[in-house]
Each structure stands twice: as C-alpha cells, then as structure tokens.
C-alpha cells in the first residue's frame, strides 16, 4: 500500500508540473522579432535584467496575488484626512513590490507633480518601468538608471535634458507613444546606450545617435525621405539589428556597418538597390557573412533586376523577384 501511495503522489506532482503555465520573455534579438510583435498582445515581459531581479519580481507577484499594489496606509489612527491623502496617492500598476532602489533617496527624484518617480512608476534595482501610466513627458529618472521602459503613454517630445547625466543607461524603450519631436542631443551623449526602441510613434526626424548602439527599432514612424541623416549608422561598429519598417522610406540608408545581422525595411517605398548596397563590386570574392536577415517585402522594388547587389550575402533578401 505504501508503494502505491508514493506512485500516486508522484503522478499528481508530475501532472501539476505539466499543467503549470510557461513564461516566455520578450526577445529583442530574435530573428522573428516582427512576428513576435504581431502575436504579442502586451509588452510586460522584460529581458536583460539580472536574474535575481526577475526572481524577486516573480516572488513578490506570488506573494501579492494582486496586480494593483497600494501604498501603505497610515500607521496610527483612522483620521479621515489621512485616508483622503492615502486615496490621492498614485497606485503602482505592477505585480511586484517596490524594493528599495539602488539610488540616492528611497523613491528617486520627484516629478513635476511632486510625486517620487519610483512611486509613480516601478523601480526594481536600476530598472524603471513606467508603462501605461498616461505620462505626457519623461519623468525625472534616478541617476543610476540602466533600463528605462515607458511604453503605451502619451509622451509627445523628448527633450535634451530628459536623459542628461544618465551615464549608465543601456536601454530606452518608448514604444507606442505620441512622440513627434526629439531634441538633437537627446541621446547622443549617452556613453553606454546599447538598445533604442522608438517604434509606433510619429517621429519625422531622427536625431544623431550614439555609436554604441547595438539594436535600433524605429519602425512605424513618419521618417519619409529626409528623416534619417546621411551616414547615420556608418560608425556604429557594434550595430546588430536595425528595424525601420513602415516609414515611407524611398531608399536604403547607407552605408551600413559590417556588424549588421538583421535589416528590416518592409512596407516602405524603396524602388531600387545598387550593386554596392551590400557588396563590394571591386572585390568579387568578398562575402558579407554577418548580414543574414534582410526584409524588403512590401516595397515596390524588383530584386531580380540587380542580382549582383546580393551575391555576397549568405541568404537572399526577402522581397519581390517579379
């Protein structure tokens, strides 16, 4: 009987494990990045955060069991004025508890409404999440901020001082705002910025960017014919992924760094490609090994007219050959 009981218990445990939902983190570097964006209804999965921070967040979610985390109530008494003040305090829209951030000041700098940024948003170590908070401007960020997410807000402009002196910033994600204007020095002086995501906005002119970038997504904006400066990406020697889909571009922004692995330009107005766009016409043995993912589908270009333009590539571009 004891053996049967242990077998039954083992089967119950295995069944519970198999029934548990899996968690997939959003991967910026995926080869099917665009497909993931189409299939993903929310952007609340984060990556490149130290494992212990992610684990802390998951633990606090299990403990809270509630998406809305209210600020602590008054310690003594039940004075009505104190209750009213408590009700007027913004809620943290996140499942994680606000741990003590690694910044000067417990809750970081204050916004224009005199709320601490880490109370209005959610700070986990050096990562700041301000997603879906109806913000109309970049909040003042703690000086040690490394990753900043402010997606699905109403931000219209990025000022040159919004990220000033934030020398540790590695990622900025401002997906799905109303951004139409960016000051020229908004990003250029950030010494360690690696990933910049500005997709789904109204940007008409891309400012000068730091050469440290490895990942750029400016898809679904309004860059048009003149929105990208000449040789904008030339000196980005570590740039791996460049996404400029749905922008009414009529040309491929050249030159592109040798480090580039993925170039997505679908759904633009590109009409032609030159033989030296990707290859070296003076060196017929040249092979561009890194660039394996080129998307030109949704453009009026006929790729069959310039076969020499991609003879050096490991894979044919995706697009029309008719």
Swiss-Prot record:
Disulfide bonds listed in the record: 118-130, 279-312
Pfam families to which the protein is assigned, alphabetical: LRR_8, LRRNT
Region (Disordered): 58-108
Xref: SMART domains: LRR_TYP (SM00369), LRRNT (SM00013)
Gene Ontology biological process: articular cartilage development; bone development; sensory perception of sound
Top-level taxon: Eukaryota
Keywords: Disulfide bond, Extracellular matrix, Glycoprotein, Leucine-rich repeat, Proteoglycan, Repeat, Secreted, Signal
LRRNT domain ranges (all copies): 106-143
Main location, first listed in the record: secreted
Modifications made to the protein after synthesis: The O-linked polysaccharide on Ser-96 is probably the mucin type linked to GalNAc. There is one glycosaminoglycan chain, known to be dermatan sulfate, and it is probably the O-glycosylation at Ser-64.
Keyword Lipid metabolism on entry: no
Family the UniProt entry places it in: Belongs to the small leucine-rich proteoglycan (SLRP) family. SLRP class III subfamily.
Role noted for this protein: May have a role in bone formation and also in establishing the ordered structure of cartilage through matrix organization.
Xref: PANTHER family: EPIPHYCAN (PTHR46269:SF3), EPIPHYCAN-RELATED (PTHR46269)
Name under which the protein is recorded: Epiphycan
Species, as recorded: Mus musculus
Gene of this entry: Epyc
């Amino acid at each position: 009987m004891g053996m049967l009981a242990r077998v039954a218990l083992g089967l119950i445990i295995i069944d519970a494990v198999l029934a548990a939902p899996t968690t997939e983190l959003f991967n910026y570097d995926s080869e099917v990045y665009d497909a993931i964006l189409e299939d993903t209804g929310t952007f609340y999965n984060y990556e490149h955060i130290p494992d212990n921070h992610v684990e802390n967040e998951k633990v606090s979610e299990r403990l809270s069991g509630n998406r809305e985390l209210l600020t602590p109530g008054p310690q003594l008494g039940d004075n009505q004025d104190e209750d009213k003040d408590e009700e007027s305090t913004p809620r943290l829209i996140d499942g994680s508890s606000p741990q003590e951030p690694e910044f000067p000041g417990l809750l970081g700098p204050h916004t224009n409404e005199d709320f601490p940024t880490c109370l209005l948003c959610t700070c986990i170590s050096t990562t700041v999440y301000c997603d879906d908070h109806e913000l109309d401007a970049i909040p003042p960020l703690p000086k040690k901020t490394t990753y900043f997410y402010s997606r699905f807000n109403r931000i219209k402009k990025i000022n040159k001082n919004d990220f000033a002196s934030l020398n540790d910033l590695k990622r900025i994600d401002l997906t799905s705002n109303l951004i139409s204007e960016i000051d020229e020095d908004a990003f250029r002086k950030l010494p360690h910025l690696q990933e910049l995501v500005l997709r789904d906005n109204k940007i008409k002119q891309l400012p000068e960017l730091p050469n440290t970038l490895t990942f750029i997504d400016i898809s679904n904006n309004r860059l048009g014919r003149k929105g990208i400066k000449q040789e904008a990406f030339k000196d980005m020697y570590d740039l791996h992924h460049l996404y400029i889909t749905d922008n009414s571009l009529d040309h491929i922004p050249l030159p592109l760094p040798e480090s580039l692995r993925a170039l997505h330009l679908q759904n633009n107005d590109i009409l032609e490609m030159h033989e030296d766009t990707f290859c070296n016409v003076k060196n017929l043995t040249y092979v561009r090994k890194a660039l394996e993912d080129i998307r030109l589908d949704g453009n009026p270009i006929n790729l069959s007219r310039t076969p020499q333009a991609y003879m050096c590539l490991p894979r044919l571009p995706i697009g029309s050959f008719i």
